[in-house]
Swiss-Prot record:
MF-aspect GO terms: carboxylic ester hydrolase activity; palmitoyl-(protein) hydrolase activity
Keyword Hydrolase among record annotations: yes
Family from the record: Belongs to the AB hydrolase superfamily. AB hydrolase 2 family.
Alphabetic keyword roster: Hydrolase
Record-listed E.C. numbers: 3.1.-.-
Hydrolase is among the record's keywords: yes
Domain of life: Eukaryota
InterPro entries for the chain: AB_hydrolase_fold, LYPA1-2/EST-like, PLipase/COase/thioEstase
Enzyme class: hydrolase
GO cellular component, one term: cytoplasm
Protein name: Uncharacterized hydrolase UM10204
Amino acid sequence: MPTSPSREVAVDATKVELVSKPLLASAALNKFSGYHFNPSSSGVDSNLLILLHGLGDNDSGFFNLGQNLQKTLPQTAILTLQAPLKVPFLEGDHWMWYPAFDQFAELLTKPNPTVTVASVVALLDHLVGKCGWSAGSIHIFGFGQGATLALEVLISWSKSHSQPLGSIVSIHGSFISHPTISSSSTPVLHIYRSAREIPLDSTRWSSHRKSTSALTLHRLRGNEEDESMLKGSEWDSVMSFWSKFFRNRIKWELEGKVVPIG
């Protein structure tokens, strides 16, 4: 039985996703000590990867990392942020996302990331409201203190926004606050080092479980004290995770046309 030909239906131009999404100037960006943005090399910005460095670092190395990731990730723009606070007692380009040390250079037992969390959420609002990104197309990768910030941003965002973010990857991050709200559906990959597997139902992950209904844990072999960055094949779990959520828009999507089924 022959089928009738499909008709192309134009999409309302005001609702078509932009092909390119430049980073527009905003006071939200000025809350950070620096940032670098690089659009997708293909000219099609379908995914935005925000990279947050660790304690005492700066964003230059993560910008290089992001550019390398762009060679593999489809239609992905990158934005690296540099933490707003200088690390005390150190000379040079060393930054922290929130106060981490007391006056004796000892680590704080109860740090307060509230100010920087609010700054990142304000930036996300700018990216969604002014730059054309949907929240579901924004992915955050954090390492160390940057991973902790990413997890805290997830909690704050979920309290005030109904749309989930694209994903969160936490490398050695931890929660400072303890989520009490209903879980977000934002997918979260948390990577940790340990000599043994720590079950998902362990009390260690109670805050992680409360923060999202889509939690994935991945253990790297090693000592828990080893909080070094991923190396070589240790990236495999991250790339596999991202492959489930990063978009790759096809030609008819970019032309603002759809082909109805039936």
